[in-house]
Each structure stands twice: as structure tokens, then as C-alpha cells.
Amino acid sequence: MHISAPHFWWKNKSFLRFLLAPISWGYGYFSCRFMGRQPPVIDLPVLCIGNFTCGGTGKTPVVIAFAKVAKELGFVPGVVSRGYGGAVKGVHLVNEKYDTARDVGDEALLLAQHAFVAVSANRYAAAQRLKKEGCNLILMDDGFQSRRLYMDYTLLVVDAMRGFGNGAVFPAGPLRVPLKTQFSFMDSVLLIGHSDARDNVSFLIARTGKPLHRAHLKARASDEVAGKSFLAFAGIGNPDKFFQSIKELSGHVVQTYTYPDHYFFTDKNLTSLVQKAQMYNLWLATTAKDYIRIQTIHERKDLKNLIVFDVDVDFVQKDFCRMLLEEVITRFRKRSCEFSCAKGKG
């Protein structure tokens, strides 16, 4: 679920939260029932990297980090993605040379730079397609709440700045499913960043008795940033985090423009942004996800002063990805053995 998160989601007291509470209760009831269903099983190890809430948490760079380590360990990882924002139907294997963000979504194109990616609303069918391509490890990008594919391990990502928001379920708050239900199905949590909300998240996770891991996002840019003044624009789930990353690289953010998550920029949008930047002698700045969507428009020569920002994940526990992948494989082998034993007895 990718939408522009309203501000009241991140405030503890709000009239809108109270007003939307009855709808939230109904949504929460049915979402809990969805999570209780039995998902189809594939004979490959499956690691789900998801989140508790609607909106951006830094999940995509985490999936990329796991794909990189998986390849280092000798696996052929395949990523199952919903393909948010894309128009393709059925099961589609992403080809980064020929597909555009309008076809498969911006996240799928970013992920395809590091692993095989299959996009589909049917996650089981997508996993089967990846198996045919020779993949021997499935990384599921999101899909924790939908339960459309059996998961050997579930890692949920939390943005420390936002935490669980106001603690309410959609649409009164950002939670996709009531926290208690999500806690019961998850295996561990990855908390990214620093903030006051981090302490509340840590407290709630500690009460579940399940592991809490920590990481930080390290910004990088396509050109030198320090000392430059920027007009920054983004159509992502959490644009404030992007604006902060410019400052962390010693850039000066003078103007900011935000658009809905997964927004496809028009020529008119870009012309307006370029003119405003030129008027105040500013550099343009955007994210790697936004730039992939901008590339669906024919090449523009007036974007030469555009700097693209991306992020890498810096895990506090340096061998975190390796250790978690080993746990995924251990669980997969255990269920495979149990299935073989049960079949033999039958």
C-alpha cells in the first residue's frame, strides 16, 4: 500500500483520528483475518522484508543490501515485488534495459540492478517465475500482511523518526494491521535511524521478546554536495528524510517541493522546477527513485545541474545480513525435512 501519508498519522492527538476510528476498527478486523490465512508454499527459502505502516521506511535499500550479500554467499537471489506504480499485468520478469518505471514501478527497476525481479499481485506465481530463472533464494519486498506466499523469516523495517505513528490502523493512522497481530507473526525488527520515537519502538519490541536490530542510512550523491544550495524535490513516502540527507552531506536546502509517492513527473513539472532553480541560482536535487521515474520522459538537457541522491544501509551489526540469511536457510531446511518425513509416513 503506497499513499501520501497525512500529517495527522504522526500526531498522538487528532480530531481526524477520532473521526475515522470506526472505519479503522472495521479495516483492522478484516486485515487481522487476512493475516490468519494459510499462504501457499514454494520449495525455496523465503525472506520477507516488510514494514508495519503505510509509507516509506527505508525498506528498498535493505532489500538491496540482502541481495548483495546473498550473491557474495553464492546464492542466486530473486526479488518478488508488487510493482507499485507499474502498469504490467500478470507475472513479469523485470528487464532494466527495456522496462520503464511506468511498466514495472520505480522500486522494481532499482532492485533489478542487483537481482532478478518478478512483479505480480500474485506473489506465489512471481516466486515460481524466479525459480524457473534459476533463483535459489526469494527476497520478498513487502507483502507481510497479505500472506500470499509462505515466509521462512520476516524482518520488519521501522523508521526511527516516525515509529508507529499515532498507533492507529488505516485510515485513522499508518498501521496496516493492529500492532498486536503484526507482532505475533513477525520474527524480528530492523530499526533505522535516530529519534525520540526510537525509544517507544524499542520498548514495545522488547515486550514481544523478539529481536531488535539497528541500522542507519548513509546518503551518497552523484556529484559533490558540500557548500552547494539546492532546490530539492521528491515524490517518495518520506521526503523529509531525503531533505535531511542533503544537509548531512553539507548541502544547503533552500527550497523543497513534495509530490505524492511514486509520482510521475510531467514536462511541465520539470520545466517549472528548472526555472525556479535558475531564478535563485540553485542546484536541483532528487532521489534515485524519482530519477528513475523522470527517465520515462525524453531526455532533457536542462537537467544538467541535477544531483541524484541515494542511500546505503549501515548495519550496527556488520555481519547482520549474513547471519539472518543463514537463519533463513536453516528454517527452510527444517521445513523441507519435516515435509519429506511427513510425506514418507504418508
Swiss-Prot record:
The keyword Iron does not apply. It catalyses: a lipid A disaccharide + ATP = a lipid IVA + ADP + H(+). It comes from the Bacteria. Pathway: Glycolipid biosynthesis; lipid IV(A) biosynthesis; lipid IV(A) from (3R)-3-hydroxytetradecanoyl-[acyl-carrier-protein] and UDP-N-acetyl-alpha-D-glucosamine: step 6/6. GO terms for cellular component: plasma membrane. Signal peptide: none annotated. It is an enzyme of class 2 (transferase). One of its GO terms (molecular function) is tetraacyldisaccharide 4'-kinase activity. One of its GO terms (biological process) is lipid A biosynthetic process. ATP binds at residues 53-60. Transfers the gamma-phosphate of ATP to the 4'-position of a tetraacyldisaccharide 1-phosphate intermediate (termed DS-1-P) to form tetraacyldisaccharide 1,4'-bis-phosphate (lipid IVA). This is Tetraacyldisaccharide 4'-kinase. It comes from Bartonella tribocorum (strain CIP 105476 / IBS 506). The lineage of its organism: Bacteria, Pseudomonadati, Pseudomonadota, Alphaproteobacteria, Hyphomicrobiales. The gene is lpxK.
